[in-house]
């Protein structure tokens, strides 16, 4: 099923000089299907479920520091998702169970920080390497998320708080 995530503003990258006002991102499964204005996407995808968010929608972030403290690895990973991140740096995911918890919900474990962005259908695709550990994907280089790239999105309100996080196409955090 397709989901059309609509926000006051869509940014392909957080430093995007030309955001799409009243824009949206279509998500099909775990992939991005299209990026554009609400009107054009609604016309192209009339059967898509629409989720409307107050704030700015853009690429999910990479959590670049120590993971928040919590009683369990699962809760530590969930705390990262609540911040709008769908990837963590490997150097901070060394505690027992953290990588398994990340893999279960689709959070990427990266060897280094990368710049994330949502590109148009003609953008550069992601390059990933699957490690020998089942279920863990280590992204060695991400130069953009294309129209067929993984759907990792975050929505932030005017105060900079994360309103929603989409990880590999799944809504994994929504602030009440």
PLM features: residue spans?
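Short, acidic/turn-prone active-site loops that include or flank metal/cofactor-
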Residues: 55, 67-70, 93, 112-116, ...
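Active-site loop-helix segments enriched in His/Asp/Glu that coordinate
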Residues: 88-122
